[in-house]
Design a protein with these regions (language model features):
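Active-site-adjacent structural elements in folded domains
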Residues: 259-266, 297
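Catalytic binding pocket for nucleotide-activated donors in carbohydrate/polymer assembly enzymes
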Residues: 287-317
Length: 726
């Protein structure tokens, strides 16, 4: 309809796909199949059409008889094979990928066994895989296209298949004279081969020496790709995976150090490679080098919405290593971003309704839901409140309000996991992808957990419980609600996160939150002891004020409510005990210990300060009642009780001072020779020199970052001691 086309702004292909989608929603799969088959003759490389065709075909075969099923599948196969045979389509990937996709869907849906493919005029999928490599090896996407179909290659077929690919590349090399330093089609063919080795699990069989020899080869190939950042990035990514294997599987700190040296060299020579920068963020975060992580994150061209999807790369990291001020600034910026995004999407939604653009409404609503319920957004809000209350805000009432947050409860079960782990590509479509999915689910649980067991909820309930003690309308009922929830949550966490539990340490993994270190140690015990005392004091306060009888105010009852000094001392000594980790690239373990202890002791200080406020209110009420009673004056009674609280505060301050001493001691270790590992001798001379040239800069960056963490924590210690004395 020419009149309709004149007034409709959308392209015809877009409208055609929308029409097919509506037919599918209506269940009219026959029409979708007919129209898709007809349109594919004109647009064989349009993957949306293939998707519509396959979805409707396999929705139909479930409900039709065998003869009709055979006719339908024959029709689909005929369309695919006719397009493959068309000479004009030789360089179009769509029909070839459609052929492989059809076979995969036939097998996965148990429609046809792979041994019966010839009944549909289809052949061995391995032949189709090799044909695809032969036709499209020069395209950077070749391996990515093939990855979903690698499961067709059985274990006993891997060697023969790889030999065929190797022979093909050898022929290519003989046919083409490679220009030194230039990326050619032969390089891309070799990249397909190297990726296949990784994807088919051949790297797992290599020894440490063989893996470093493979890295040597990758480095030399990077040197041959001086004109292509993309080709160099692929080789660098392969090398990084090999070195990460050595580190993650064998705890080889040398390999992690070599990975950092290698990627620093790659980024200098190929600055437009974002993958190497992101992998470097992962490597540096693994050893607590936060300054470098921040530097690379700032340098990356992160798109607006990627601040959410890639937020996991730095979430929880800065405060983990004592960079509290930097963490507060980072989270405050992210909070502003999420608030602004919600506002803008809401405005777009309103505009869509006003303009009658109703097709846009469902997508905008979905997008708004994903942004507003993003677990990174919720986590950022919680961390901002926690860190600000502990290390930034001075006024007690403002601290209480900050920790308490909104009245509206957080729906932890309804949060959206928007994390994009695909930003660091995975080579293996099966085993590695399975581990990636396991890691995503487990880290999602650790941070926002469907089973009520996560670091976010723990922080949230802890803050609510602490804030409830100091609220002007504090009641035992309100405090008990949060405290009971916190107790249940802590117990559940202890059952779920054992001390010896470890997450899959994949290259794509987010920085671990070390939740088990918090809940399975005296750190959490100290806070629970203080909160239990706070609950008892609040109960005593309610009893005294409601009775209006001054005799109820006596030091024995209040002293019984306060924490036992000996018990507090034992817990503080245990949690602040020195944890100096020795060995190459282990320094960050000490920093993490000091940082976590400071966060716990800061919460402990806040609880003591709020307890003091409650006691002041009790004695203020007592003084307002009039007469003296007994041998002690009211002020003397008050002093007896507050002296106990002073003893507890002194013990907590001793813990803070102990951490300060540890920080001063470990600062001297930054000059130690065993802080940084040596480069392995398994590389040849050329590669060894490349890594050696990066050593001075990398070493100084690591030491500088650790120094920054120590200095930041020492400033925090000074503030905590000053606040305690105020």
């Amino acid at each position: 309809d020419s009149l309709a086309r004149r007034h409709i702004k959308h392209p015809a292909q877009f409208l055609f796909c929308n029409i097919l989608r509506l037919y599918q929603l209506q269940g009219d799969h026959g029409t979708v199949i007919d129209r898709s088959i007809n349109e594919l003759k004109n647009n064989p490389d349009n993957w949306s059409l293939w998707t519509f065709l396959f979805d409707s075909t396999f929705a139909s075969v479930k409900n039709i008889e065998e003869e009709a099923k055979k006719r339908l599948l024959d029709r689909v196969v005929e369309r695919i094979l006719s397009l493959v045979a068309e000479p004009l389509n030789k360089m179009l990937r769509g029909p070839y990928l459609a052929r492989l996709t059809l076979i995969r869907k036939l097998v996965e849906n148990d429609v046809l066994a792979s041994s019966l493919l010839d009944t549909l005029k289809l052949h061995d999928p391995l032949e189709y895989l090799f044909e695809y490599i032969r036709l499209f090896y020069s395209k950077p996407c070749c391996y990515v296209d093939l990855k979903p179909f690698l499961f067709f290659i059985k274990d006993d077929q891997v060697d023969n298949f790889m030999q065929r690919v190797s022979d093909f590349i050898t022929l290519l090399k003989e046919e083409h004279n490679q220009e030194k330093g230039k990326t050619t089609n032969v390089h891309w063919a070799d990249i397909v081969y190297q990726r296949l080795q990784r994807g088919l699990g051949l790297h797992e069989k290599l020894s440490a020496v063989e893996k470093r020899r493979a890295v040597t080869y990758m480095v030399k190939m990077i040197d041959c790709c001086s004109d292509s950042d993309l080709a160099a990035a692929v080789y660098a990514h392969l090398a990084a995976n090999l070195l990460w294997d050595l580190y993650a599987d064998n705890g080889n700190a040398d390999a992690l150090y070599e990975l950092i040296l290698l990627l620093e060299w790659v980024i200098k020579n190929h600055p437009s490679d974002p993958i190497s920068a992101i992998v470097l963020c992962k490597a540096y975060s693994s050893i607590g080098v936060t300054t470098q992580v921040q530097r690379f994150m700032r340098a990356l061209d992160i798109k607006y919405i990627q601040r959410d999807t890639l937020g996991y790369l730095i979430y929880g990291l800065l405060e983990q290593y004592g960079r509290f001020s930097s963490a507060i600034i980072h989270y405050t910026e992210l909070t502003a971003f999420f608030d602004q995004t919600e506002k803008e999407v809401s405005e777009c939604l309103t505009t869509a309704y006003k303009n009658g653009s109703f097709l846009q409404v469902p997508r905008l609503v979905e997008f708004l839901n994903k942004i507003s319920k993003s677990f990174i957004a919720v986590g950022v809000d919680i961390q901002t409140r926690a860190l600000s209350a502990c290390f930034a805000v001075d006024k007690v009432q403002l601290v209480v309000d900050t920790m308490y947050g909104d009245e509206e409860p957080i729906d932890f079960l309804g949060l959206e996991d928007n994390r994009d782990f695909g930003i660091i590509p995975s080579f293996d479509a099966n085993k590695e992808q399975q581990r990636l999915n396991e890691m995503k689910q487990r880290t999602y649980h650790e941070q926002i957990d469907v089973f009520q067991c996560d670091a976010m909820k723990l922080s949230h309930l802890l803050m609510k419980s602490v804030a409830a003690v100091g609220r002007s309308k504090c009641t035992l009922k309100n405090l008990s609600i949060y405290l009971d929830e916190l107790k249940k949550h802590v117990e559940h966490c202890r059952k779920t996160y054992k001390e010896d539990d470890s997450l899959p340490n994949l290259l794509q993994s987010p920085p671990p939150l070390y939740l088990s270190e918090l809940i399975n140690t005296p750190k959490m015990d100290l806070l629970m002891l203080l909160l239990k005392s706070a609950s008892s004091v609040v109960e005593c306060s309610e009893s005294i004020i409601s009775s209006n009888i001054i005799e109820h105010v006596h030091e024995e009852k209040l002293l019984h409510c306060l924490p036992n000094v000996a018990e507090v001392e034992e817990l503080v000594i245990a949690l602040a005990a020195s944890n100096v980790a020795t060995g190459a690239l282990c320094f960050h373990v000490t920093l993490r210990h000091c940082s976590m202890v400071l966060q716990v002791l800061s919460f402990a200080q806040l609880i003591i300060k709020l307890l003091e406020m409650v006691l002041d209110n009790i004695f203020a009420f007592s003084l307002g009642q009039g007469t003296k009673k007994g041998s002690f004056s009211k002020n003397q009674r008050k002093n007896v009780v507050l002296n106990r609280l002073h003893e507890v505060r002194t013990l907590i301050n001793k813990g803070v001072i102990s951490i300060n001493t540890q920080l001063s001691d470990v600062h001297k270790l930054l000059k130690s020779n065993d802080l940084i590992p040596e480069i392995s001798n398994d590389y040849d001379e050329a590669v060894y020199i490349i890594l050696l040239k990066e050593q001075v800069q990398v070493d100084s960056s690591i030491v500088a970052s650790y120094t920054d963490s120590i200095m930041d924590m020492q400033k925090t210690v000074k503030r905590m001691l000053n606040q305690s004395q105020a």
